[in-house]
């Protein structure tokens, strides 16, 4: 019996030893697995709890105008995040008190957020650096800052279709922000530091720090002053004509540089999802889904000057005429006979006016925009030659401008261009082009016949201002010879001097131009009452420095012709540009009717009551803009005609009145004024300034004509 008990005990000991050894073996195997197989994984998890890995976002590159003015900048952005579970109960009240005081937030709101049950949330965004420093010094547990940057556009909706905007993630969505996103975005960096259980940084020294690489900067060809002049004129044209939209492009014909590009209605890139005009607001409100809403937003963001096509009408006659002149198929003083229409393949194609011109020279036919004459010269060219010249002037293919979504346009191939198509294309009907193609073709005539690639970005620079990449002016091809281009310019000058372009005349300057009135195609048919009014111009003829195209889409009023709708707008913009560029009036052009005219004095930035009295003394009347809510105690912010223009005695000047509280004013021309005179003038305007030297003003910044905000600083040099 005793032996049996001993055997049982031995068996139990053996079993216990076996189980113990098995457990030890299993533990060793498990430890081996953890150490060898799962070790890296657990090590990473442990490191995650000990270390904090933070992405450091780069600053997106700055976008400048051609003179160095900042059009798009990145502002540092600090967002404060909180993990409520990592704040000790004993520290919670003190943390709420500190955050409320520094961030100027309501204590109860902070308490409510902390008890919301969220694991983490952003308590405040876009915190300035001083507040960030104070919060860091408070060493509050359970909080951290996420650092990035936000995009800011100092001029608001200024050139919004050209500049574009970015997403919340700082990715370019439109304009050069999109097409040059790779240059602008930069490369993110990383920072790793040790943290405690409450998510607080233990050491001020990073274990690892990879510095971000900031984005490259862009220098555009756009000139801020020219763009502002164009924006103002086109906004007025949109309102005055109750138009669907308006477009304007100013180009340096010798380089292809885009000096200004305006499309309205536009939007504010600082708040890109909020429409500024009823047209877009109504469509977005009517959208039934997020997808439809986004589609309407993209429509608002697209740039019609580059993306959209239209039938150009009579400005296209410049291409037809240039082709015929180049081929020697017509000469300026050749006579044609007009009976008011032309029959082509059994179809009667009429002129814009039903009255026949009878015997008329080619130059006069261009002046009066006689369709029948252009049909005849297109027939002389034939479909093959005509399409070759259309292509030579850059139509039917992208211009290559560095903006997203460029349109191509539509034109007939030789096989598709029958007699009727040949006839209608000759005067710009039945062919679709983009505005950027049209202004490029006009510029080719102003550039000795050479077609330039439109340039919107001049250079890419690093953050030190060193040039990384340059985009030089590029000749695409020669469209016509210099001789032909000179002939065409002379004819275009005659159009302004004697023909349909007379509304673009500027006293003292030689201007060439061509107006157009094109009926719109809607649902596949030309619709009565729907027109595109346009005008293209070049100045000065003796040395072309500016080519300008203005388009008014669907003007609603007594007139819809390009000569009465777009011509005056071209005149206003061209006059502003030429003066800003310092182009002096041509002596020969100044002589005409000088003695019988009165020079409008500088009346901008002066009280309306004073201006009215001064104009009356000069024998000039005035009218106020009916579109404005007039404040007769306000300031004259602009006029039409402009100061410096000559007007007949007894004529009237349109005055644009702004409230004395308006923030934006026009920088006056200070040249020749004394320190005392400048001090008094700028003080009344609310502009501070620093005088340099003594005597009379010889140089100023900002330059005359620039739009500035009250309170801005000006610098004036005196000699």
Walk through the language-model features, giving the residues of each.
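Residues at or immediately flanking beta-strands
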Residues: 144, 217, 245-247, 335, ...
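Short glycine-rich loop/turn motifs
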Residues: 159, 215, 219, 245-248, ...
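Periplasmic/cell-envelope proteins involved in peptidoglycan metabolism and beta-lactam response
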Residues: 1-282, 304, 309, 384-394, ...
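Short, flexible turn/loop "capping" segments at secondary-structure junctions
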Residues: 72-75, 114, 155, 209-213, ...
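Beta-lactam-recognizing serine transpeptidase/beta-lactamase-like catalytic domain environment
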Residues: 72, 196-201, 205, 254-315, ...
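Ligand-recognition elements built from short beta-strands and adjacent flexible loops
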Residues: 471, 505-508, 522, 529, ...
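Extracytoplasmic/periplasmic beta-strand context in beta-sandwich domains
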Residues: 61, 246, 334, 340, ...
């Amino acid at each position: 019996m005793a032996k049996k008990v001993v055997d049982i005990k031995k068996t139990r000991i053996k079993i216990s030893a076996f189980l113990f050894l098995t457990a030890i073996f299993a533990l060793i195997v498990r430890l081996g697995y953890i150490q060898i197989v799962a070790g890296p994984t657990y090590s990473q998890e442990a490191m995650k709890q000990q270390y904090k890995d933070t992405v450091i976002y780069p600053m997106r590159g700055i976008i400048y105008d051609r003179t160095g003015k900042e059009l798009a900048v990145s502002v540092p952005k600090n967002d404060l995040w909180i993990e409520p579970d990592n704040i000790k109960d004993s520290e919670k009240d003190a943390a709420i008190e500190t955050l409320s005081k520094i961030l100027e937030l309501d204590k109860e709101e902070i308490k409510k957020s902390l008890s919301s049950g969220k694991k983490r949330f952003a308590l405040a965004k876009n915190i300035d650096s001083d507040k960030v420093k104070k919060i860091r010094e408070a060493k509050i547990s359970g909080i951290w800052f996420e650092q990035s940057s936000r995009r800011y556009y100092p001029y608001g909706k200024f050139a919004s279709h050209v500049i574009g905007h970015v997403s919340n993630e700082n990715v370019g969505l439109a304009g050069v922000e999109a097409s040059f996103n790779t240059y602008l975005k930069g490369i993110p960096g990383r920072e790793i530091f040790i943290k405690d259980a409450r998510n607080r940084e233990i050491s001020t020294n990073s274990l690892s720090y990879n510095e971000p690489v900031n984005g490259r900067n862009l220098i555009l060809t756009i000139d801020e002053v020219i763009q502002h002049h164009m924006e103002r004129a086109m906004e007025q044209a949109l309102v005055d004509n109750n138009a669907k939209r308006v477009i304007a492009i100013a180009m340096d014909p010798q380089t292809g540089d885009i000096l200004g590009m305006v499309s309205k209605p536009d939007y504010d890139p600082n708040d890109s999802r909020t429409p500024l005009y009823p047209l877009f607001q109504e469509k977005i409100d009517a959208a039934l889904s997020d997808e439809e809403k986004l589609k309407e937003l993209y429509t608002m963001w697209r740039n019609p000057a580059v993306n959209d096509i239209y039938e150009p009408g009579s400005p296209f006659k410049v291409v037809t005429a240039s082709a015929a002149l180049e081929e020697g198929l017509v000469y300026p003083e050749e006579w044609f006979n007009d009976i008011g229409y032309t029959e082509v393949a059994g179809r009667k194609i009429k002129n814009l006016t039903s009255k026949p011109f009878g015997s008329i020279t080619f130059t006069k036919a261009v002046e009066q925009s006689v369709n029948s004459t252009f049909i005849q010269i297109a027939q002389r060219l034939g479909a093959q030659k005509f399409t070759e010249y259309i292509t030579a002037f850059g139509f039917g293919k992208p211009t290559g401008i560095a903006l997203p979504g460029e349109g191509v346009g539509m034109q007939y191939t030789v096989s598709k261009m029958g007699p009727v198509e040949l006839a209608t294309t000759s005067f710009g009907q039945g062919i679709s082009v983009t505005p950027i193609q049209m202004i490029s073709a006009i510029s080719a005539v102003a550039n000795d016949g050479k077609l330039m690639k439109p340039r919107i970005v001049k250079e890419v620079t690093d953050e030190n201002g060193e040039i990384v990449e340059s985009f030089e002016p590029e000749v695409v091809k020669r469209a016509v010879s210099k001789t032909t281009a000179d002939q065409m310019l002379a004819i275009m000058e005659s159009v302004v001097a004697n023909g349909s372009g007379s509304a673009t005349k500027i006293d003292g300057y030689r201007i060439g131009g061509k107006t157009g009135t094109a009926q719109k195609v809607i649902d596949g048919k030309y619709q009565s009452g729907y027109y595109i009014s346009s005008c293209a111009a070049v100045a000065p003829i003796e040395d072309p420095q500016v080519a300008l195209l203005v388009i008014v889409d669907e003007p609603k009023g007594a007139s819809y012709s390009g000569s009465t709708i777009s011509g005056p707008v071209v005149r206003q913009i061209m006059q502003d540009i030429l003066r800003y560029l310092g182009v002096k009036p041509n002596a020969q052009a100044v002589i005409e009717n000088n003695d019988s005219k009165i020079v409008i004095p500088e009346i901008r930035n002066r009280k309306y009551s004073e201006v009215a009295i001064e104009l009356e003394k000069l024998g000039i009347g005035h009218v106020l803009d009916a579109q404005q809510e007039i404040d007769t105690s306000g300031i004259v912010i602009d006029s039409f005609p402009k100061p410096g223009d000559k007007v007949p005695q007894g004529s009237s000047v349109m005055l644009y009145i702004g409230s004395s509280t308006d923030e934006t004013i026009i920088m006056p021309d200070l040249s020749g004024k004394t320190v005392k005179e400048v001090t008094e003038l700028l003080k009344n305007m609310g502009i501070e300034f620093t005088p340099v030297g003594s005597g009379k003003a010889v140089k100023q910044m900002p330059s005359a004509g620039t739009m500035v905000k009250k309170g801005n600083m000006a610098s004036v040099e005196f000699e």
